[in-house]
Amino acid sequence: MVNMIINPASKSGHGLEMWKELETCLIRENTDYKAFLSEGPGDVTRIVHELCENELSRNSSSVLRIIVLGGDGTFNETLQGITDFDRVEIGYIPTGSSNDLARDLGIKGEDSSLLSGILACREPFLMDLGCLTYHDSAEEHSRLHEETVSDTRYFAVSCGIGYDAAICEEALASHFKNTLNRLGLGKLTYLTIALKQLILTKRGNCTITLDGKEPFELKSFLFIATMIHRFEGGGFMFCPDADAQDGRFNLCAVGPIAKLRILFALPSALKGQHYRYPHIYPYDGASVHIEADRPFWVHTDGEVSRKSSSITIECLQKKIHLLK
């Protein structure tokens, strides 16, 4: 049995059409399946949690197979609902606007071919899982936060605090984004919001602690991206050395660089060449603790729930069982 999780709003609203084509493939191959369509924020998490509760409790040795049809955000919501990562196998057919997970894993091609590969896979790719913990009470929630905001969140690609998360928060609530996505101009949304947030985002000071060692200060920081994979934000290679199986994060920390210089540094990040600019620092660690002097937006795989001034991020090595 395979459980299909579909975001019908993905692919500029064509997710449902894509599912209908894939459903034809499943029927043709006589594949036993169930289909679940999400209807709004938090719905995928609820569906996956119920599947885990119902299916995994019946048999202590059973394995739940899930195939996600959506973007990085849909995959992220799926992770929040999983109760036992050792007994859940996930396939992924990317239909989002960023697709950073698929970009780094080389998942590309016809949807029907991807589906066939997932169904035939018997040796999952074991991939690191990130776990974010908020340590302070939420003072400000995002405009599209779920009804219940947990103090912990999982992620597969990256977790960011500051400027990158502020872009995500505005993009998630942007009606302008939905319009441009339908016109095939989704990238223009992020460019517009990125320029706006570059002007509006206020910097702060923070301390960073890696693997429990001596904390160090980063003054006037713009953002800190903690990454499992190389890409974030639709193709920016912020961490070119990131390895999704090594049990460690790679960090891109942007300090007191002039905002005008950021306009030159960001395009260079598309090829991972941004560290030649001053005040952009690479770090790594299996555990990251950040204490900021005030709350900043925080994202996990582009999903934003709340602001925070105190977070811990831990890497759980090879916890995700990915079918591909």
Where are these regions (language model features)?
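Catalytic core of DAGKc-family lipid kinases
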Residues: 3, 84-220
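A residue-level signal for conserved active-site and pocket-lining positions in enzyme catalytic cores
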Residues: 7, 44, 130, 167, ...
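Glycine-rich beta-strand-to-loop/alpha-helix junction loops that act as flexible
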Residues: 8, 69-71, 93-96
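ATP/nucleoside-binding phosphotransfer catalytic cores, i.e., glycine-rich phosphate-binding loops
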Residues: 15, 210-218, 237-324
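Short, solvent-exposed amphipathic alpha-helical segments in soluble enzyme
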Residues: 19-22, 52, 83, 172-175, ...
